[in-house]
Amino acid sequence: MSYTPGIGGDSAQLAQRISSNIQKITQCSVEIQRTLNQLGTPQDSPELRQLLQQKQQYTNQLAKETDKYIKEFGSLPTTPSEQRQRKIQKDRLVAEFTTSLTNFQKAQRQAAEREKEFVARVRASSRVSGGFPEDSSKEKNLVSWESQTQPQVQVQDEEITEDDLRLIHERESSIRQLEADIMDINEIFKDLGMMIHEQGDMIDSIEANVESAEVHVQQANQQLSRAADYQRKSRKTLCIIIFILVVRIVIICLIVWGLKG
């Protein structure tokens, strides 16, 4: 199901799109972590690193898109009867999105560290290695050099080669892109933090209204209690007055009867 933001305002469709994106981000984070675990092993290759970079950029784009959708979801018009359910749904989406972003950013930081380590190894190998066989790529040999427990190198003073420079430039460019992507995720975290803060203010306002209502109810109960007490006292007073009147009437009747007798 496709969704065009800003058109239609279908909350159910938008919520489904947000949930789908969150699931994709979570799955991509798992795949990125799995790929990171292959770096520095015999499975490492330029193609693997390229795939890793593409997966990171795709996930970063998903995160930006999801952030925009959640903002739009919170601004959709709603009826008073739907407000509570809409808020619960938004809170759940924000919580799930925050969890998926946390895992993704953790993988991003690990990827950046791996790239920095790779650049350092390229620079180091250029200074200590006498060169690599012509039938193998520089990056393949670096992977092999990393995986060996006791690499054998021929120490020579040799200037850095063009291949080394190319690899370094590529990896440094990848590092800069990763750092920019990490900053993008930080901005999204700020947006989510603002949403949570606004929700907290709303909750505080609701709690204040509830407390105010409770105070009013207590005051009303006290007034009702006082009214009931007053009513009971009034009835008691009325009964006493009636009793006194009856007694007086009886006395007067007795006196009149006595005079007649």
UniProtKB/Swiss-Prot annotation:
A molecular-function term among this protein's GO annotations: SNARE binding
Annotated SUPFAM superfamilies: t-snare proteins
Function recorded in the entry: May be involved in protein trafficking from the plasma membrane to the early endosome (EE) as well as in homotypic fusion of endocytic organelles. Mediates the endocytic trafficking from early endosomes to late endosomes and lysosomes.
Key words of the record: Acetylation, Coiled coil, Endosome, Iron, Membrane, Phosphoprotein, Transmembrane, Transmembrane helix
Pfam families linked: SNARE, Syntaxin_2
Protein name: Syntaxin-7
GO terms (BP aspect): intracellular protein transport; synaptic vesicle to endosome fusion
Cellular component GO terms, alphabetical: early endosome membrane; endosome; perinuclear region of cytoplasm; synaptic vesicle membrane
Coiled coil: 47-68
Domain t-SNARE coiled-coil homology: 165-227
Transmembrane residue ranges: 239-259
Residues where Phosphothreonine is found: 4, 79
Membrane topology: Single-pass type IV membrane protein
Region (Disordered) location: 128-148
Topological domain ranges for the Cytoplasmic compartment: 2-238
InterPro entries: SNARE, Syntaxin, Syntaxin/epimorphin_CS, Syntaxin_N, T_SNARE_dom
Subunit structure as annotated in this protein's UniProt entry: Interacts with VPS11, VPS16 and VPS18. Interacts with VPS33A. Forms a SNARE complex with VTI1B, STX8 and VAMP8 which functions in the homotypic fusion of late endosomes. Component of the SNARE complex composed of STX7, STX8, VAMP7 and VTI1B that is required for heterotypic fusion of late endosomes with lysosomes. Interacts with TPC1.
Modified residues (Phosphoserine): 45, 75, 125-126, 129, 205
Vesicular side: 260-261
UniProt similarity note: Belongs to the syntaxin family.
Residues bearing PTM N-acetylserine: 2
Main localisation: membrane
Compartments where found: Early endosome membrane
Keyword set includes Phosphoprotein: yes
